[in-house]
Design a protein with these regions (language model features):
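C-terminal structural cap/anchor segments
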Residues: 127-181
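Signature for the C-terminal beta-barrel architecture of outer-membrane proteins
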Residues: 2-138, 143-147
Length: 181
């Protein structure tokens, strides 16, 4: 389904900007795609470089700003990078990191504090039209190494419940919920 929004846009051959108010009638408590937010985006082409910038103010997540650039260095090579800093972000966290079975989905929505997302990458396309893309990224909204270790340990122990006369559907449900990570 779509999202209700109001939008103003301008563009020409080298520049574009947008101002968007998404979910203008939604209450402040809404999260994720239902959050009311005001966002601005700008694009500028300068020779072989595309520059992007944005700012967003969400009712629930607060302020977010970012910038990106893409440079077509040659006919075969393109380099790109982006950075985003945010006041808050919606994410998920497990309320059950142990070996016990859950009676409901342990992966619950949570609001994170300030953080950032960074991406650096490039692509190469040879004359034979075979391409290679390489990217490195950092994302503060991602689960931590400790949370992934808990997730792995929980996945390993959940099948052992099948030998304890636990209904297979309960074990299957818990394993399926692990997919929410």
């Amino acid at each position: 389904t779509g999202r209700p929004l109001l939008m103003a846009e301008h563009f020409d051959a080298d520049t574009a900007w947008s101002l968007v108010w998404v979910n203008p009638l939604e209450p402040q408590a809404n999260t994720g795609g239902q959050e009311a937010a005001l966002a601005a985006r700008v694009y500028q082409r300068a020779g072989a470089v595309d520059w992007h910038g944005f700012a967003r103010q969400g009712e629930h997540t607060g302020t977010s700003v970012g910038a990106a650039a893409s440079w077509v260095a040659t006919d075969a090579i393109e380099l790109h990078a982006s950075v985003r800093a945010y006041q808050h972000a919606d994410s998920i966290r497990s309320t059950n990191t142990g070996a016990s079975l859950s009676t409901g989905n342990p992966w619950q929505a949570t609001r994170l504090g300030a953080g950032q997302q960074i991406l650096v990458g490039g692509s190469w396309t040879g004359e034979s039209q075979i391409g290679l893309m390489v990217e490195a990224w950092h994302d503060d909204t991602a689960l931590s190494d400790a949370q992934w270790r808990d997730w792995t340990a929980r996945n390993a122990v959940l099948p052992t419940w099948l030998s304890r006369r636990v209904p297979p559907a309960a074990v299957a449900g818990n394993l399926a919920w692990q997919g929410n990570a």
